[in-house]
């Protein structure tokens, strides 16, 4: 009997926490499997006797993308009420109590598991980033409770004594081995097997030979997963004025395959960035691994019950350490507590060990040193120069290089065969000497036009009403206007311009007014477009102020005509304030006849009924 740990992570917190749980079980001599929820075969759930679930919460209390397949299956009305009667589960949710629906995805999952007959093992816990010690305040007692409840059911797989978390390096669970250079491996390294290509502008991908592999810089090669497609960068244009502090780009990608299936407005485009070459070289040099960086290797799991993570190449696939660091592992990640726990096990210097003990025992120390200044793993390792991460543990210690998701800013109908994105280049200063730059945005901006990259198109999270007569109100400040632009294009084509309203927000009409000329054209066709340029007057004006100004028609569209509401943009106060503004418009204070409580409930019910949606980040 092997417990199954399933996690759904948005930024990596839930994955990091799940892996800590797995290490705790293994430290106690027990076997355990740890997987993202979307890698777990759903049909096996009723037969999974011991289950441990960890999930973060996405957007307005929504499940993270990795949880959606499992969650959708659990919501099927045809499921018997006792289908999970053999399942015993523990649950830990991660969230931030400053948000309205704190740990909502975890709470929904808990309720549904119990509805289907599953039995709780102990009380669930909710990790709160706002707690004095972050999620640790809830996690550590919950972990001990879970171990106490589960361990008696599990046989010891090793007679070795319990590993002391902070001082002893546990055995590796993954292995990096030299690959044979036989002809069969040479064939495996071909383009057909690995889908490796080099970004030669306007060129075709070049095949890789074994004898060239050690010389080629893996940082310039890409692999394409089966469900991704090739696209070519056609356009990279700055939309903000040159003297404006923020650089926002319109990126256009063209599908290489003319038979690519059209995407739907509201769809999401995923990109897989690459680590910077200088960071990779610095890591290799500090870890004294430069001489091994370009040797052809394969990877495998050393535990039968633990498959390789999905962010790594499949077992047996020839690769190099340089390629792993460039395409699969994130060395610019800001380290969490678990990373410092690993360093504590590896350090050979007494002063370093004392400093690492301080980090492990005090979350504020980690926040001050790493989180607040966005210090990276590479920079952290430079500070702990007596610590080396061995090849045997690199795959376990370094976090995955996560794909980045962007709302598609175009409709297929207006831009056939192309995807347009609105990308803000992230750059800011902290107390560190070197300015911080977003990994994906800086990587994307550095690609020359003509570069071929793999992209993935995911199903929409926002859907237009099927009936074009239904009025819609779109609210998209800043880069949040991306999916709204696609919706406006579709509605104009449907002849529904007069039933479409857009509220766009920017700092100034002269600096960051995205797609201004397009909005002028759409206005002439009947689209109601209101722009809140917050800094163009003495008193700052935001989209929620314009919504309140238009209270009569907002009430008419939302209540009388049963219109839809869409909100997209930053997940700070904006979405909540927009919902409150709409609720005010339909209340007695505005232009309606509802009480304050009734109007807020009406807006919430709109989202429950899928009369619109919210996309925030």
UniProtKB/Swiss-Prot annotation:
Gene3D superfamilies: 3.40.50.360, NADPH-cytochrome p450 Reductase, Chain A, domain 3, Nucleotide-binding domain of ferredoxin-NADP reductase (FNR) module, Translation factors. The keyword Mitochondrion applies. Residues 3-147 form the Flavodoxin-like domain. FAD binds at residues 404-407, 438-441, 617. One of its GO terms (biological process) is iron-sulfur cluster assembly. It catalyses: 2 oxidized [2Fe-2S]-[protein] + NADPH = 2 reduced [2Fe-2S]-[protein] + NADP(+) + H(+). Its cofactor is FAD; FMN. InterPro entries: CysJ-like_FAD-binding (IPR003097), FAD-bd_FR_type (IPR017927), Flavdoxin-like (IPR001094), Flavodoxin/NO_synth (IPR008254), Flavoprot_Pyr_Nucl_cyt_Rdtase (IPR001709), Flavoprotein-like_sf (IPR029039), FNR_nucleotide-bd (IPR039261), NADPH_Cyt_P450_Rdtase_alpha (IPR023173). Its main location: cytoplasm. It is an enzyme of class 1 (oxidoreductase). NADP(+) binds at residues 479, 534-535, 540-544. Keywords: Cytoplasm, FAD, Flavoprotein, FMN, Mitochondrion, NADP, Oxidoreductase. Its EC number is 1.18.1.-. One of its GO terms (molecular function) is oxidoreductase activity. It is found in: Cytoplasm; Mitochondrion. FMN binds at residues 9-14, 56-59, 94-103, 129. NADPH-dependent reductase which is a central component of the cytosolic iron-sulfur (Fe-S) protein assembly (CIA) machinery. Transfers electrons from NADPH via its FAD and FMN prosthetic groups to the [2Fe-2S] cluster of DRE2, another key component of the CIA machinery. In turn, this reduced cluster provides electrons for assembly of cytosolic iron-sulfur cluster proteins. Positively controls H(2)O(2)-induced cell death. Belongs to the NADPH-dependent diflavin oxidoreductase NDOR1 family. This is NADPH-dependent diflavin oxidoreductase 1. The gene is TAH18.
